[in-house]
Amino acid sequence: MSSPLASELSELAALRPGFRLSAPHARVAPRAATHARGRGRASHAGQPRLRSSCPGPSPGKRRVVPSGGAQPRVLPALSSRSHLFPMASHPQTRIQAYLEKNKIGPLFEELMTKLITETPDQPIPFLIDHLQSKQGNRGQLQRTLSGSAALWAESEKSESKGTRRDFRSYDKPWQLNAKKPKKSKSDLAVSNISPPSPDSKSLPRSVEHPKWNWRTKPQSRDFDELNHILQESKKLGKALENLSRSIAISDELDKETVTFNSSLLRPRVIGEWIGREENDADPLAAEMLQPPIPRSKNDQWESEDSGSSPAGSLKMEPKNKGLKQQQQQHKKLLAAMLSQDSFESIHSPTPSVTEEDIDNEDDAMELLEDLNDLRMEGVTTLVPSGSKFNQGRPTYPAEPQAKVTLNICSRCARLQGDNLEERTEESLPILHSPDEKIPDSFDSLPGTEEALMEEGDEFEKASKLTGPGEASSGVGHSLKNYMEEDESLKQLQVVHQPWILPSDTESEGVEAEQEKRSADLLLCVPCSSCPTLVYSGL
């Protein structure tokens, strides 16, 4: 009897699409269904039909339901086995559409996820509060998450406390029924309540992010703290960069100023200046006066803590300069000094040459051949005796020599001086004219014998005036004295003004002019043997 009933129900559903089934009518007794089927066969058009008002075994109770059309409809009672038949697909589709429209399945899934993840002590008030929070968001499309994604989204919601909401009410089909991750047992239990739609399987999973509104400041301090940390780190980075740059600049300045004073960067030099200013106007003059004191190879460098100022030491060269470069620089300095001296000597007007200047010049020339200077020049094979470098040069004693001024009287031909007073006292007085002069010294001058012969001629002239006896005796005595003192005169070195040779052929006007010219350079001194004035050189 069941197979005719199923075929009849399918026909009724096909002919009357507006016919609705309700769940209570599915539990009508079989006899009521049979009675309704019998009455439906005998019914005519336009007559009202009676139906059972409630499910039950008695077939007598009926209710009249107007169908809204010309013919009344009879609702057949379905058995409890109606879900096994093809007719059950229609209400199932309707229920599925209702659940999808109102998001019932995702709502229960979200509730179960919250219960599982948060596990409150009182689950019913917790669910009520959650549903009340959902009540104000009817325009918002709810999305469900499971697992860690749901926990993350819910933590974001709890932090925002409902301040950030999505007020966009348009449909977003790409976010409906997002694809779920692999479900746990609890998720499977929840999903059995409402199976997901087949369309949701192909949709990608989306994660709910709250909308950012620039007008409202978020209550969460996490972003502000992170931004503050980033700003502080940037400030610290800039400060460290500036500090490192300033340290590098100060290190460069210290290297420039302390390069010659640092014991680590101090180069090895052979000599050292003592008591010499660093910015000396004439460094070579100080070098001549104070030669460098050489160091031995075993001497160790003194520390800079000894208190010696850097101005008192030799200006150090950088460490990369070798000994050869120092030697070349020293030679250049010497060559510049020599060229400067030669330039000054050329352009200087009538330099006065004295014995002290010659002595100093000789000392300076000897200083260049000293062992210390040769060591500074880079000579390694040195002979301590020094005879190798001073051959052919006279040795000058350290003590100063006595200066002797010699004058020759033109009348008595006697030398005038402190060491020759005894000889001049023995000379004979001879009368002469005071206009004639004699040179201060002969000094190995070529033509000294001619000068002596001229003196002999003068004595002959004088003898004609005084007498033959006196003249012969005076001339012979004076010639004898000249021959004895000739050797001593040649050995003497006197540096004075140029002398004036006597002449017996000059007239008195010429002699007066020469006397006037020489008076500026010579000094008149009385002769010790005769009353003749002798011109002595200054």
Curated annotation (Swiss-Prot):
InterPro entries xrefs: DUF5586
Compositional bias annotation for Basic and acidic residues: 154-171
Pfam families per the UniProt record, alphabetical: DUF5586
Region (Disordered) residue spans: 20-71, 151-211, 288-331, 458-482
Effect in UniProt of substituting K161N: In a colorectal cancer sample; somatic mutation
PANTHER family per record: RIKEN CDNA A830018L16 GENE, SIMILAR TO HYPOTHETICAL PROTEIN
Stated name of the protein: Uncharacterized protein C8orf34
Taxonomic source organism: Homo sapiens
